[in-house]
Amino acid sequence: RFYTSSYEDLIIKNEIAEFRFAGNYTAYLPYSTNKEKPMAMAFQNTYEVKPLSEAPQELAFLPVTVDCKQAKVTLLESDLEAYPGMFVQPDGKQALKGVFAPYPKKTDFYPWRKQEYVTEAENYIARVKGNRTYPWRILAITEKDAEMPVNNLVYALASPNRIGDYSWVKPGKVGWDWWNDWNLKGVPFKAGINMDTYKYYIDFASRNGLEYVVLDEGWYDPKSGDMLIVIPELDLPELIRYGKSKGVELVLWTVFNVLDSQLDEACRK
């Protein structure tokens, strides 16, 4: 990682980060799904597997893995705060080049979900305090694939906990409504964003040892930008009670800036 020691705030014009490999190894790359604006997407995709020299020279997001035969190298970041996350772009040879989103100059909101997006960007990537550290760039080396999910370098290099007691945060497996778009077949009710559908999901999660069910977009009206008003088709307290009776907790999805603007009220409610 880099660090700077300055009494004045700084503007970071750009950063050069390149990862060059000794051979034309196979890369596992999750490419952006937005061809027009590749840095504006949901950071979720399947991995494309190609030799480095044949990999499309498009933006991919982290983590990226390169199979160096005797071991795999996974490129990661940690302690990423007030700085753009790194994308990588194959160079058509045997390297991956770091690419960084420019700093937003102007933003607007999508009217259908109150989600902020960039309309104009600056010609630099960050405005930062002069005395600070920058993200760790991690090369996690594993000899067996089973070692990847238990590698703790990201956690070990992160800043110490600043939120106090976090014992209420519990990991677990989830059932996700968007995975099949509420598209249930052969059920004695109309599938959709309603009580019957989510109770069906909760029953499935309970039978199969899933600790959580996610209520993704639609449990509040995204156009309103008000997560305190649940749609009339759902009785959220009753759904929470039903889930607890089955040993299943609920996770509520929301647009970040909606939660940020209503954080105190939402947590009290």
Residue ranges and their predicted role:
Residues 129-204, 208, 212:
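An acidic-aromatic substrate-binding cleft motif
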Residues 1-156, 161:
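N-terminal accessory beta-strand-rich subdomains and adjacent acidic, glycine-rich linkers
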Residues 174-269:
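Substrate-binding cleft of carbohydrate-active enzyme catalytic domains
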